[in-house]
Amino acid sequence: MPDVRPGRHELGQNFLTDRSVLDRIVHLVSQRQGPLVEWGTGNGAVTLALSELGRPLEGVEIDSRRAAELRRRIGPHVCIAEGDILRHAPPQDAVVVSNVPFHLTTPILRHLLASTTWRHAVLLTQWEVARKRAGVGGTTQLTAQWWPWFTFTLDRRVPSTAFRPRPSVDGGLLLIDRRREPLLPDTDVRDFQSWVAKVFSSRGRGVAEILRRNGVPARLANQIAQRRRRSHAPVLPRDLRAEDWVEAYAAV
């Protein structure tokens, strides 16, 4: 029986071919200290660019054939491991780099944020995902749940023409950095995230009413809502910033 393997497009990843974007990724990584890990090395475009930094680099690739091909092309200071990135644990204080397969964006982000060892991440995701995770135009529940421990920054938009095969949407460079001084202790992760989920799922005419229903004193709830008001439209949970969530949670 022939050895039939899925094509890279079937695996959900679009190769990055734009040199200016590769250079930007390398620049962002160079500003962050720590061993490098690339999730999903693919054809090695990002891997080869990162290898020029001369730092310890581990690549994780699920396609055994592509992993073997890349091992033959890469320098001795780079380790290419065959494996599932959703089961990979980055080394201590690592910088995680990934051209994230679009169909795995959410599980990869959840796995990354739940990992306790890495310090920085430079991710290429779908544009709308990058915007929402960075809280541009309104944040998501996932970002709000992790904001006390991480910062999320949108670096730039990456046009769909930068990829092969060309996807139907643009990409975006998303930076996630672990806070050196968390806004809440690690022991609060579970309770805080559960409370944020309740706030996002609660009904109300605006965030002040929603916060009051979830234990926040009325005066503080009104102050937070007023702080984020930009128009006559009601302020919603997606409009809150990290400091708002922490202040409200601490008052419950």
Language-model regions: role of each:
Residues 198-252:
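C-terminal lobe and adjacent flexible extensions of AdoMet/dcAdoMet transferase-like proteins
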Residues 1-197, 222, 238, 243-250:
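Catalytic cores of RNA-modifying enzymes
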